[in-house]
Structures are given as C-alpha cells and as structure tokens.
Amino acid sequence: MKITKIETIRLQSRATLIWIRVHTDEGLVGLGESWFGCAAIEADIHDRVAPALLGQDSSRIEALNRQMRPYVGFTGTSAEMRANSAVDVALWDIQGKATGQPLYAMLGGATRDRIRVYNTCAGPDYVSKSSDVRPGNFGLDRETTQRGKVFDDLR
C-alpha cells in the first residue's frame, strides 16, 4: 500500500490539538494525533514529512520512522518529534485496518484485560464530564474518524 496523501486537521474548538490523516492507494486512511505547537507541527508535516513519505509503502513503519528521524531536532518545542509521532500512530492505524487486528495484537498481544484512561497533555476539558467519562469526537465528522467517534471503543 502506497502513501498517496498526508493531511492535517485543526479545529478552532481544540486549538492545542492536531489530527493527521495518512491516505493510501488502497483507500485506507490512518488517523494520528498530536498536541501543542500545532502550527509548527502542521508546517513540519507538509514541508518535511509528506514529501519524504509520499509514494512509500505504508506497512514499512519502522523504515519510515528511521527515514524521518535524521531530521528531528531534540531542542526547542520538538515539533518534529510530535509530527513524527502523529504519523507513526496513523501508520499503525492503517496497518491495523489492513490486517484486521488491533494494535495490541500486532505488538505482541494483550497483557491485561483493561487499562485506565488518562490525559497527559490536552487539558482538563479534553475528557467529557459525563458519568461514563467518554470523550466525544471533538467536531471530527464520521468520514474523518471512520468509526463515528475517535474513542468509540473505550470502556
């Protein structure tokens, strides 16, 4: 599967978050996410990452990560690292969709039945205050998430 397009999605209502969609020639789309310094992340995605990855095989995740790594700066706001991370998440999303497997299975299998949900970076209103503590889709439409909600499967 070749990467045909990499796009960024930013919402005014979530100014500290950015989503990345990686498209393939087989119609699969992977969704990744990052935070903080979204303008710098977006510029890095479009100026550095997309030109390097377009036309590449999306299943070669580690090779693509190594290809992006030499350009990473480890000082400042680390926008490059966060851009790479978002693309990595999107590539794993594609791989899971292509194989019909959840990420935990591709990485060696489950080690526990459930995990706690936590929020490290997006602020206290990231998770809804509803009784079931489930986040919404943050204004992303069904086409963007391909499942209706970004976190549809949280328990």
Regions picked out by a protein language model, each given a short descriptive name:
Residues 106:
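Active-site-adjacent beta->alpha loops and helix N-cap segments on the catalytic face
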Residues 109-110:
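Subtilisin-like serine protease catalytic core
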Residues 23-99:
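Metal- or metallocofactor-binding catalytic centers and their adjacent structured scaffolds
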Residues 1-21:
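Short, Gly/Pro- and small/polar-rich lid/capping loops
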Residues 8, 33-34, 122:
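Short clusters of small/polar residues that mark proteolytic maturation junctions
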